[in-house]
Amino acid sequence: MSFDRNQDGKLKVKTSSKLPVSPTFESMKLQENLLRGIYGYGFEAPSAIQSRAITQIIRGKDVIAQAQSGTGKTATFTIGMLQVIDSSSKDLQALVLSPTRELAAQISQVVRNLGDYMNVVALACTGGKALQQDISKVNKGCHVMSGTPGRVLDMIKRRIINTRHVKMLVLDEADELLSETLGFKQQLYDIFTKLPSSVQVVVVSATMSKDVLEVTKKFMSDPVKILVKRDEVSLEGIKQYHINVDKEEWKFDTLCDLYDSLTITQCVIFCNTKKKVDWLSHKLIQNNFAVASIHGDMKQDDRDKVMSDFRSGSSRVLISTDVWARGIDVQQVSLVINYDLPELLENYIHRIGRSGRFGRKGVAINFITREEVTKLKSIEKHYSIKIKPMPADIDSLS
């Protein structure tokens, strides 16, 4: 895994106080086996957010860390967490909560990869699969649990997991976790009441709304804030275009035309509803296009299979709702198509960031009906960007 060092260096980092910056992982005084895992994972030097946040996490400070999608946020809290975990004990010591099952699974894998030489056990505990599977794994010992709030709270209430020794709680994609729409907020409150009062809290997100900052005041003690202001969140590596289609029903033909014209490695197509995802994937398959689809109503085994096939490259076009937009890193994605513009302005960066992970170049194409012109202008204003009309010379995009 790598990121564009020049791109990362352009990010302006704002902190609540003058924090020390660690130019190398060695300067953080990390355990030797953790350094082996970091370099084995492909990191060479810390990113802007890593160079500031990791040492604060290790010191035991509560931390609010905001960085753009693809700058190494997951590795930031994972490295800090692994440094302070006592692997000689079988106790659960760190809890990571995420808004989606896929993200929770990915985080547990990152913990295992970075902690490869440390004998650290990390489990993903999410809904959609038999509880008994998680119980048998937890009983063998678990240092880090990465899960969704509902499943984790259920396991705490059933006394399947013991939280007495949890010293760190991480809220990943906190803006989503703490939003009213997903209904996780009360579950998070309930989980907090089951943790030791001394628990260290780390909040990580690509966007940080005022509501999130207010909610974190309830749970955090004098947190260190490391923030990238919204208008400094870089979309520089991603070419963004729009295609005017006038009517909704014309979007499908436009998409088919793009398939014939664009040479793509892998592509993600976003729709706003599960029904639209099912409809579009069915219609494309009817027209002999090979596509896969994923959304929250699918069985967990089916979702895992879709993600596995897409990661391996055996499927190259994925149609999805916003469930896939946050945090999932598939490095080969070079094109994102917004079949529908996102309902929430904040989700625009999560969606199109799929095509420009870690500073890689990508293309984002937005289908715009007459009714969506106003929404497009709102996105441009929100991110201080200009989304250009699609050029006639499509070959120039690649």
UniProtKB/Swiss-Prot annotation:
Catalysed reaction, written as an equation: ATP + H2O = ADP + phosphate + H(+)
EC class of the enzyme, as a word: hydrolase
Binding site for ATP: 67-74
Motif window: DEAD box: 172-175
Molecular function as annotated in GO: ATP binding; ATP hydrolysis activity; mRNA binding; RNA helicase activity
Keywords: ATP-binding, Helicase, Hydrolase, Nucleotide-binding, Nucleus, Ribosome biogenesis, RNA-binding, rRNA processing
Record GO biological process: maturation of SSU-rRNA from tricistronic rRNA transcript (SSU-rRNA, 5.8S rRNA, LSU-rRNA); mRNA splicing, via spliceosome
EC number(s) stated in the UniProt entry for this protein: 3.6.4.13
Localization in the cell: Nucleus, Nucleolus
Key word Electron transport present: no
GO cellular component labels: catalytic step 2 spliceosome; FAL1-SGD1 complex; nucleolus; preribosome, small subunit precursor; small-subunit processome
InterPro entries membership: DEAD/DEAH_box_helicase_dom, Helicase_ATP-bd, Helicase_C-like, P-loop_NTPase, RNA-helicase_DEAD-box_CS, RNA_helicase_DEAD_Q_motif
Superkingdom classification of source: Eukaryota
Pfam assignment, any one: Helicase_C
Domain Helicase C-terminal: 237-398
Domain Helicase ATP-binding: 54-226
Motif (Q motif): 23-51
Stated role: ATP-dependent RNA helicase involved in 40S ribosomal subunit biogenesis. Required for the processing and cleavage of 35S pre-rRNA at sites A0, A1, and A2, leading to mature 18S rRNA.
Family stated for the protein in its record: Belongs to the DEAD box helicase family. DDX48/FAL1 subfamily.
Comment, domains: The Q motif is unique to and characteristic of the DEAD box family of RNA helicases and controls ATP binding and hydrolysis.
Name the record gives this protein: ATP-dependent RNA helicase FAL1
Organism annotation: Eremothecium gossypii (strain ATCC 10895 / CBS 109.51 / FGSC 9923 / NRRL Y-1056)
Lineage: Eukaryota, Fungi, Dikarya, Ascomycota, Saccharomycotina
